[in-house]
């Protein structure tokens, strides 16, 4: 498969998959070289509580960024954030991939019901969330800054 404008001799990276579409048989590919990473969000997200890209990745990893964070989240029905994020310093975009997901904002509740529904909130807007059905959401936040992790049982986790 070649993209428009791509040299016919340019190598093509593919994610290697086993099993059928939607099965658990998919394999994440890894670093192709020091500047390219090919992966599968469903598997890669498990390593950092959903976070695929941000300041918390190793500096030599192509997924390291001080500018932006990206999270792939799979939430079971009735999953809820343990506590509100207060004193937010980032801007965030949350996109519903599947399911039914509610974002709680001060004085307002936003229900994402259809694939592609999204909400954006800026600096200083506290928030929380609740999965009304099993849901998959993609979150993009900027800039990428330490903090905000909800302490997990037995200590703080890498991200929230």
Where are these regions (language model features)?
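Short, conserved beta-strand element in jelly-roll/cupin
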Residues: 86-102
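Short acidic-glycine-tyrosine-enriched beta hairpin
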Residues: 107-123
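Short histidine-centered beta-strand/loop micro-motifs
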Residues: 61-64, 81-88, 105, 111, ...
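A short, N-terminal "cap"/entry segment at the start of jelly-roll beta-barrel domains
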Residues: 1-77, 81-84, 157-160
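Short peripheral tails and domain-boundary helices/loops at the edges of structured domains
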Residues: 144-160
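Short, surface-exposed beta-edge/turn micro-motifs
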Residues: 90-93, 116, 134-135
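Ligand-binding loop in jelly-roll beta-barrel domains
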Residues: 123-148
